[in-house]
From Swiss-Prot:
The gene is pep12. Its main location: endoplasmic reticulum. It holds the Pfam family SNARE. It comes from the Eukaryota. The lineage of its organism: Eukaryota, Fungi, Dikarya, Ascomycota, Taphrinomycotina. Has a role in vesicle-mediated transport but not with protein transport from Golgi to vesicle. GO terms for cellular component: endomembrane system; endoplasmic reticulum; fungal-type vacuole membrane; Golgi apparatus; late endosome; SNARE complex. This is Syntaxin pep12.
Length: 263
């Protein structure tokens, strides 16, 4: 499914209060995708194949779902949640998803390379077996021909049968199909990366404005705090001057009263 399909109806903004619930669901999906990616990495390190392709397919479907949900989230306008909070939440989820996708793509590419190397080795071994089988069949035909002419020679048993060769070829074909699926999955991840860049670019201007406003608020708060400190300093100095003036006035009055009493 292309991003264009997901974008249909984008001009019609959803008016509901599902933003927090959907954002929480996306966060859980990203967490699950991160766990799958770690599991795939363990499979590769330990050279395990059981359940590997099931986890790969599950991760592929989960990636598509997260992409779809992020588009839905970008379309939601939740007045209760707030535009700034919504924008920051969407931006964080998008970046988290982008990080997980990059790691998933890396392990998928490694998986495809290992699978390709293994298939190439298996095909080379099969080609050798086919060649050996052909030689043995020719030798058997010669022996049968000699036996029919009265020259008896022991017949050698072929080391590998046609059915075994066909079975090995089917296994190789299946693994080649898995490589094609891996390649398709990697291409789908590239499409998702492009979609994420679109979402990030659309949110970028709003996030920049919000960050600018937050920066201004922080600057204004610091300025206000500084002005308050200056005002407190002036007030303290003014109180000190008033106290000094009062002391001087008391001293003067004391001198005058003393003079009057003594006079």
């Amino acid at each position: 499914m292309s991003f264009v399909d997901l974008e249909q109806g984008r001009h019609k903004i959803e008016q509901n209060g599902d933003f927090p619930a959907l954002a929480s669901s996306i966060a859980q999906e990203i967490h699950a995708l991160r766990g799958n990616t770690a599991a795939i990495h363990r499979y590769l390190v330990n050279n395990l194949t059981k359940n590997l392709h099931e986890v790969l397919e599950q991760s592929r479907e989960l990636s598509q779902k997260v992409r779809s949900d992020l588009v839905r989230l970008a379309n939601i306008k939740d007045t209760k949640y707030g535009e700034e909070a919504s924008s920051f939440a969407l931006s964080k989820l998008t970046r988290d998803f982008n990080t997980v996708l990059a790691e998933l793509q890396r392990v998928q590419q490694k998986c495809a390379q290992q699978e390709s190397d293994s298939v190439a080795a298996a095909q080379a071994a099969l080609n050798q077996d086919v060649g050996q089988h052909f030689i043995e069949e020719e030798e058997r035909n010669v022996s049968l021909s000699n036996n029919s002419s009265g020259q008896r020679q022991p017949l050698t048993e072929s080391k590998i049968s046609n059915s075994q060769l066909e079975y090995q070829q089917r296994l190789i074909n299946e693994r080649q199909g898995e490589i094609e699926n891996l390649t398709q999955g990697i291409n789908e991840l590239n499409e998702i990366f492009r979609d994420l860049s679109t979402i990030i670019n659309e949110q970028g201007e709003l996030v920049t404005n919000i960050e600018y406003n937050v920066g201004n608020t922080s600057t204004n708060t610091k300025n206000a705090s500084r002005q308050l400190q200056i005002a407190n300093e002036h007030s303290r100095k003014a109180r000190k001057r008033s106290f000094c003036f009062l002391v001087i006035l008391v001293v003067i009055l004391g001198v005058i009263l003393t003079a009057l009493i003594m006079g």
